[in-house]
Amino acid sequence: MIKPKQDKPLASALLAQAKEVLEFVERTDVTDFRNWLLGDLSKPLVCIGNGGKHTTYPALLYGISGGVGKTATPLEFASMSPEAVKRSKVLLLSSSGKNMDVTYASKRAAEINPEGTAGFTFTDNERNCLFKNLNRHNIFCFKNPYSDGFISIRSKILTCGLLYKAFSGKNSFTDKLNFDFKYDYFINKSGELPDLKRIKHFVLLYGSYGEPVAHDIESAMVEGGIASIQICDYRNFCHGRFIFAGNHCQSNKVPETDVCAILLTTPREAKIAESLRKEALADNMPIVQIHTDLDSSLATIQLLMDSLHFVFDLAEKHLGLNPNSPHNFSGIDKRKPMNSVRFVTALKEHGELSH
């Protein structure tokens, strides 16, 4: 087994501080941020993160609050017409505001819709492009005493906590969360349960409050060098997307199972997941089920913590990996592609999309 690199803290050690992080959120004032988020719900909210991050949670929370929320990567934001940007509110989320993704997105949003664009950040200095490009009264800068390594762990939980508090208006919520993280690993109906180290592919299914978690787990799995992963909502999986999973379970044509289904469930998905197990998953499909009894947007945070616990358990205990400092056998510098692939230059050559 490959030994985890110890140049950075183990991912599981950072996750263990989740309660402390969320108690910090409870003491943080989010009043101004809440007022901006919930002002003029008739306008869609476009949520943009740094490259590599999906901003599904604020989009979901905005939808629950009565508006229409849309998540967009910086490249997807480039495909939105100026008219669409003008008619929307734009929320840019960036811890430091220092990479070219948020620099591009903040410049474009501020040029088209300066009053309707806001920034969420943890860094208050001259290197943060949000302070250079946006109106100061629309920048919401929060303290973040929690650093991370290669992947976002504590700052991800901090961000989700601040978003939940701002949208829900609830100042106390950690008492509703379970910090004894858990998941269940079992065989669907019959057969031998494989060791997790034999699994090369994961199929993650979600609904409602689980969607933001699905994107975060995909990112953690792939960026952590752990396994390939397909994410899909429960209904779309029934439209033929079960074929790959079934073709990778042991049979007279397949020597060894190397796939596992991950089911994210709340009370809303429990019956759907049970039915799907019977109708769309092989009898000998190994399953990881991550469930919460919470039936509110707080369920996203519980599912996130339990899901990260599974991912880090898989990596550290079964594969000998530290997702917070992944092995990189290709030799490609982990940070180089962010700056060397010049997407902004290419976009400017062709201008706005057209019919």
Predicted region positions:
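Cofactor-/ligand-binding subdomain signature composed of acidic, glycine-rich
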Residues: 1-40, 149, 153-162, 168, ...
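Phosphate-moiety recognition in structured ligand-binding domains
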Residues: 2-17, 136, 254, 258-261, ...
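Conserved active-site and cofactor/substrate-binding residues in soluble primary-metabolism enzymes
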Residues: 9, 55, 154, 158, ...
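Short N-terminal or domain-adjacent regulatory/targeting segments
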Residues: 10-39, 171-195, 236-241, 246
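Anionic-ligand anchoring segments at beta-strand to alpha-helix junctions in alpha/beta enzyme folds, i.e.
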Residues: 31-88, 196-247
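Glycine-rich phosphate-binding loops that contact phosphosugars or nucleotide phosphates
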Residues: 38-183, 252-288
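Short, hydrophobic/amphipathic alpha-helical patches that form generic packing surfaces
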Residues: 59, 158-169, 220-223, 301-317
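Internal, active-site/partner-interface "lid" segment
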Residues: 147, 163-198, 325-355
